[in-house]
Every structure is written in structure tokens, then in C-alpha cells.
């Protein structure tokens, strides 16, 4: 942690796949589970750690809500802002939803669609359930690699043997309607694949790959449009773009929700050292933000981190 070798306590799957993490609890038992887990972290001799980092808690997660509103002593726990997740509430019909986009976005999408159809003989879109579609996963990784290979000096963290194996095995554990691949093909060749999960009538845009040879046609944007259509047609209420505030996401939405990490440092030497470095880094970040804000507006911003009780 910050170049200090530490024993870290984290969610299973941390930094592997999930953007939204949380405690798993039976409905109605969320608060009691949170209290029990936090008590065990504080007092159990089995919870030996230097750094506790429960990452990727969105603001409607069970653990975030408990820590943010609890009046009991949450000594040493700190909620640190991590990233924003753009998302859009879907209308009841695709046409109605499209009318909610800006006029410039609708015009750009229509122009790119017409250009693609004029240039190519055959343009086909399709949606495939994640279950039973391993070929679509292969196409996704192939297109993802092709796109990133075209960007010199940049490297994807998704296209690795470990994540390929993880996702391949994951597809065999899913049930029908847990998600879909949205594929756009040109002249019988896939040029864009989107990897979408579904949960409780919410669609989550997890990953994508597209052929850079079709960049001029906005092939990725056109496929997102088709994925949103399919999400609406299958009863989804929201379309979540997950972490990352890339400009293209805000062509389809204006809203976002924040994700946080719960931090706590152990009482040992390494835990105290990691905690000191964490606070110093936070002060430096706030100082840099203050200087930037002073140059821009002349006023000093507040901290985005919420320490529930400092150590």
C-alpha cells in the first residue's frame, strides 16, 4: 500500500472485475449484518490487517448507507471518494428515450448511421444472451485488443489472459437474462461488441471492443444506441456506464452516482505508517486542488473525503 508491504483486508474480487461491491445480506437484515461485520473488524483477533480497503461502494449500497448515517462509534473508518459512474434512467420506449438526448447527439448518431449504411452493403445488429455465447466473448476480446493496439503508448488492463479466463468461466455460471452481448456486424464481420450485465432490471455496460478501421462511423456509439434499445425492450429501467467519465458516455446521459472506498488502518507499525501516508497524500491532493481552484475561481474547495472518526 503506497509502496509499503502490508496485509490488506478487502472484498473478494477486489481489482478483478466488479465496479460495485457490497455486503451480501438477506433483505431486512442489512443493518444488523453491517453492525456485526464492522464489530468483527474492530475487535476480532481473526481480523488481522494493516490496511482495510473496502472499495467500490456506490451511494445506494448497504455498507455505504450504514457508515454514512450510523450514529454509533465508527472509530477510524473513513469514506474516500473513488470515482463517478454515469448512468441514465430509461424511458418506456426507445423513441421517447432518444427524444431526451440532445439535438446534436441525435443528429450525429443519425448522420453516422446513414454514412455507414451508404458505404457498406450489409449492416446487422444483434443481441445475444451471455449464456451460451462464448463466441461473442472471443469477438469482444479480439476487437478490444485491436482497438488498444491502434493506440500507441497505451495498454488495456482488461485484455489479459487472467481476465479472459475469468470471464470465460463466468459465462458458464450465469443464468439466462443475466446479461447480453450487443453486436454490430458489417458485411458479415463483427466490428463492435458490447458486454452488458442485467440485475434487477438494470443494465450495466461493463466492457466493449470495436474495430478502429470503423472509427469514422462512430461504430461504438451506434452500438451503444442499439444496446440501449434492447435494454428498454427487455424491461430495464436504467443503463449504467459504470466507472469512468469518458465524454462519449455523457452523450447518452447527464446523471451519475459516486462510488467510495471504506478505509481503516490497523494498530501496528505498518498500519500506522500506511495511515500517515494516506493522510499526507490526502492533504497534498487537497492542497493541489486548492491551488487549482484559486487560479480558476479564487475560492478554496472542501474535501471530498468523509472521515467518520479520525484516529
Task: Give residue spans per PLM region.
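Active-site/acyl-donor-binding loops of N-acyltransferases
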Residues: 61-95, 100, 180, 186, ...
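Polar/charged alpha-helical tracts
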Residues: 35-39, 148, 172, 289-292
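Acyl-donor binding region in acyl/amide transferases
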Residues: 1-81, 200-257, 263-264
Amino acid at each position: 500500500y503506497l509502496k509499503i508491504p502490508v496485509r490488506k483486508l478487502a472484498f473478494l474480487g477486489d481489482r478483478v472485475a466488479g465496479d460495485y461491491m457490497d455486503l451480501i445480506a438477506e433483505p431486512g437484515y442489512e443493518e444488523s449484518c453491517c453492525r456485526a461485520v464492522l464489530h468483527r473488524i474492530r475487535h476480532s483477533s481473526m481480523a488481522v490487517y494493516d490496511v482495510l480497503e473496502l472499495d467500490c461502494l456506490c451511494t445506494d449500497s448497504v455498507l455505504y448507507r450504514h457508515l454514512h448515517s450510523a450514529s454509533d462509534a465508527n472509530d477510524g473508518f473513513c469514506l474516500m471518494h473513488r470515482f463517478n459512474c454515469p448512468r441514465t434512467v430509461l424511458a418506456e420506449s426507445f423513441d421517447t428515450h432518444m427524444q431526451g438526448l440532445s439535438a446534436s447527439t441525435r443528429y450525429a448518431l443519425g448522420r453516422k448511421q446513414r454514412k455507414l449504411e451508404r458505404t457498406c452493403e450489409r449492416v446487422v445488429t444483434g443481441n445475444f444472451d451471455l449464456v451460451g455465447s462464448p463466441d461473442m466473448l472471443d469477438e469482444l476480446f479480439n476487437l478490444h485488443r485491436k482497438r488498444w493496439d491502434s493506440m500507441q503508448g497505451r495498454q488495456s488492463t482488461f485484455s489479459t489472459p487472467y481476465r479472459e479466463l475469468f470471464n470465460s468461466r463466468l459465462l458458464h455460471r450465469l443464468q439466462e437474462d443475466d446479461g447480453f452481448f450487443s453486436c454490430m456486424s458489417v458485411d458479415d464481420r463483427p466490428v463492435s461488441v458490447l458486454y452488458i450485465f442485467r440485475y434487477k432490471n438494470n443494465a450495466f455496460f461493463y466492457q466493449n471492443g470495436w474495430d478502429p478501421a470503423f472509427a469514422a462511423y462512430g461504430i461504438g456509439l451506434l452500438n451503444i444506441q442499439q444496446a440501449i434499445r434492447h435494454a428498454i425492450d427487455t424491461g430495464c429501467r436504467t443503463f449504467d456506464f459504470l466507472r469512468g467519465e469518458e465524454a462519449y458516455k455523457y452523450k447518452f446521459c447527464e446523471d451519475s452516482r459516486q462510488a467510495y472506498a471504506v478505509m481503516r488502518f490497523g494498530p501496528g507499525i505498518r498500519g500506522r505508517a500506511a495511515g500517515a501516508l494516506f493522510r499526507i497524500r490526502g492533504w497534498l491532493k487537497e492542497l493541489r486542488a486548492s491551488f487549482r481552484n484559486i487560479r480558476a475561481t479564487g475560492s478554496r474547495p472542501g474535501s471530498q473525503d468523509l472521515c467518520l472518526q479520525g484516529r
